[in-house]
Curated annotation (Swiss-Prot):
This is Orotidine 5'-phosphate decarboxylase. GO terms for molecular function: orotidine-5'-phosphate decarboxylase activity. The active site is at K64. Pathway: Pyrimidine metabolism; UMP biosynthesis via de novo pathway; UMP from orotate: step 2/2. One of its GO terms (biological process) is 'de novo' UMP biosynthetic process. Belongs to the OMP decarboxylase family. Type 1 subfamily. Its EC number is 4.1.1.23. InterPro entries: Aldolase_TIM (IPR013785), OMPdecase (IPR014732), OMPdecase_AS (IPR018089), OMPdecase_bac (IPR047596), OMPdeCOase_dom (IPR001754), RibuloseP-bd_barrel (IPR011060). It comes from Pseudomonas syringae pv. syringae (strain B728a). It is an enzyme of class 4 (lyase).
Length: 232
């Protein structure tokens, strides 16, 4: 497998294997990793991960596990056995849940995926948090959950680029994975707390998840190359 040379992760947010592979076949695994989320994984199961890995891609399995500690840890173990490069869980599952996931990975031999915690979804603003009983600014909740993740030994966090600078300052060892990235001139779609790729890296993000600006471009390979050029 050729190691990816950029921080770009392209979201394969498609309902079918055929559609996902149609895009993947236009992308260079040296220029990006790929993200498999709930829709595609539910449709295709582990086969899509194996297929993408055979095409040379490192895979971020974005299923945001959130359950009791043992159940979540076993799901993370299963993901590791698929050979994924990165897997995530919801930090709101708590310290014991995240620590159980860390422990199960450390008990394995061989390569371990990066274990990433999800703080506050980038679609959520203060009014959304208030609706679920958290009448606080999203960044406050992000910092609370980040502290738990650090204590549990997580490798990093999924966060908005707008939270990246504060998180790097508070937790410099955590790798930051940022969705909601939109190259200049792109539509915001349903993401709210967004920055451009260059802005996100400058703010402290380590990996950038980009979906529709590449997947729905007339020429996805050209769109990916433009993002990589922006980061050079």
């Amino acid at each position: 497998m050729s190691a990816c040379q950029t921080p770009v992760i392209v979201a394969l947010d498609f309902p079918t294997r055929e559609a996902a592979l149609r895009l993947a076949d236009q992308l260079d695994p040296k220029l990006c990793r790929v993200k498999v989320g709930k829709e595609l994984f539910t449709s295709c199961a582990a086969d899509i991960v194996e297929t993408l890995r055979h095409r040379g891609f490192e895979v971020f399995l974005d299923l945001k596990f959130h359950d009791i500690p043992n159940t979540t840890a076993m799901a993370v173990k299963a993901a590791a056995e698929m050979g994924v490069w990165m897997v995530n869980v919801h930090c709101s599952g708590g310290l014991r849940m995240m620590a159980a996931c860390r422990e199960v990975l450390e008990q394995r031999t061989g390569p371990q995926p990066l274990l990433i915690g999800v703080t506050v979804l980038t679609s959520m603003e203060r009014e959304d948090l208030a609706g679920i009983g958290l009448d606080i600014d999203p960044q406050v909740q992000v910092l609370r959950l980040a502290a738990l993740a650090g204590k549990a030994g997580m490798d990093g966090l999924v966060c908005s680029a707008l939270e990246a600078q504060a998180l790097k300052a508070a937790h410099p060892s955590l790798q930051l994975v940022t969705p909601g990235i939109r190259p200049a001139g792109s539509a915001q779609d349903d993401q709210r707390r967004i920055l451009t790729p260059r802005q996100a890296l400058d703010a402290g993000s380590d990996y950038l998840v980009i979906g529709r600006p590449i997947s729905q471009a007339a020429d996805p390979a050209k769109a990916l190359a433009a993002v990589v050029a922006e980061l050079a």
